[in-house]
Amino acid sequence: MFPKYTSGIVHIGELPLGGKFPIRIQSMTNTDTNDIEATIAQSIRLVNAGCEMVRITAQGITEANNLALIKKGLRQKGVTVPLIADIHFNPHAAEIAAGIVEKVRINPGNYTDKRLSSGNLSNKAYDEELERIVERLHPLLTICKNNGTAIRIGTNHGSLSSRIMDRYGDTPEGMVESALEFGRICINEGFSNVVFSMKSSNVRVMVQSTRLLVQKMMAEGMNFPVHLGVTEAGDGDDGIIKSAAGIGTLLEEGIGDTIRVSLTGAPEIEIPVALAITERYNTERSSNHVIAGSEHLKSGYQAKRETIAVSGIGGNYPVSVIIEKAGEICIVDEHFNTTGILPQHNLSQLQVAEGNAVEMRSRLARYDLYDTKPIILKNSYLTDNLLHFQVASAIDFGSLLIDGIGDAIWPVSKKINAETVAQTSFAILQATRARITRTEFISCPSCGRTLFDIEKTLQEVKSATQHLKGLKIAVMGCIVNGPGEMADADYGYVGAGKGSVTLYKGKDIAFKNIPENEAIDVLINLLKQSGDWKEAAEK
């Protein structure tokens, strides 16, 4: 059994985080940090929506110093919410911010100098680099101790240091070790006001790395709180479902003390989604809620089970979506066309796990998961609120699909129309990589570093490429963080400056500093040159 993780308590200003305290909700402004009044105004809107911590980008010295003016303005208006500085590449900015705000977020992959290596680092060279990290981190820790400032050590899947990449590769193990190295330094320096996070736009990687982080922390006697989020989740329904599947899977396992839902657009739209996700956990958090399940489920099993085929379910068939239409149990495709009818008598040849995530896992724990009967995951939903339906079903089904469990999903709702239920189901399969039926778009929520209208640009990129099933295309606001956080993408559209864009193929730059008004045409030409373009079918 995966043991229950109980985090310690840290304080973000006056706000306690961890232990049995409620799961805290946070977001990040997307205003220019140099625009003091706009940042203050947006922070207030976030707080009024239910945000408990506000993060602000501080990419340079000027922005870090501006945090003092923003904090002063908020306090004068009676807003006492803790502020978090988001730092990349600039330790000096972090040190300035640590004397002003309640928490500083650093990325171990780019906080210290990224010395390029030729591979196969010797143990001596590896240890020497660690010593340099200690030297670089010491001033920040001293300032944080003197000011009661917390630190989030936030690893990103796509921005691991070359030293970590040499030894561990681009893996969850590398992500975890990158964070734990910094955590051990904090402990050795007598600093414990620490929060960890593992971020990826790939829900499976995010879940796997966070589970591994918790296991490693427990093995080393650490109990730091954990921040959860699917980075660059995208926009609209897809972003909501992707975030809920990743965050909810871990909350179901008792992991997670604060969350941020990253949606492209105004950050205020993130808060209702975050509230919908945390609602059922905050009512149970004061109890010893722990998910029921077998060791097989809890160990993070992700390979798809081998099963026989029954009426188009299981075997070599893709994970199916079952919908009740006109009194019949139908298998439908992503266009809501019926591709098969499931006779009632065939249900006896299937294993049906019914209920919410807790009930389904409890039932599955009694099954022989090495039996070759296909498993249908089924649950009924009484809500007529689309957001609540999307969040609940993404958690219930997603938390099992991520672990390779489920040959079909069968959401039942009498208050949400059947076509919307089917669309939500396919979005859950896409989010968990259980079945790919369309283009996947990875996009950042934008921040003060973004110099173009990312919502408009994302819609333009979608319009041009949404027919390219199976491709992953990223739209990122800035060159500072974009390339690292779109590691899972096949192609990337990244803001490079005012009016200019850099295009990526995988992790490599394909075209630099393209005028923004030409970028989509150049992206299409890049797709054609790479053999990934096809014309959209006529409707």
Per-region residue spans from a language model:
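Glycine-rich tight-turn/loop motif centered on a GG-T
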Residues: 102-136, 163-173, 510-512
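Catalytic alpha/beta core domains of metabolic enzymes, predominantly
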Residues: 124-133, 165-308, 345-468, 472-475
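Glycine-rich, proline-tolerant flexible connector loops at the mouths of alpha/beta enzymes
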Residues: 30, 49-74, 108-128, 194-203, ...
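Conserved, mostly hydrophobic/aromatic
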Residues: 25, 86, 153, 196, ...
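N-terminal amphipathic alpha-helix/helix-capping segment at the start of soluble metabolic enzymes
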Residues: 1-27, 141, 145-147, 283-327, ...
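Alpha-helix-loop-beta-strand connector modules within alpha/beta enzyme cores
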Residues: 63-85, 132-148, 213-222, 461
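Glycine-rich phosphate-binding active-site loops on the catalytic face of alpha/beta enzymes
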Residues: 52-53, 101-118, 253-268, 399, ...
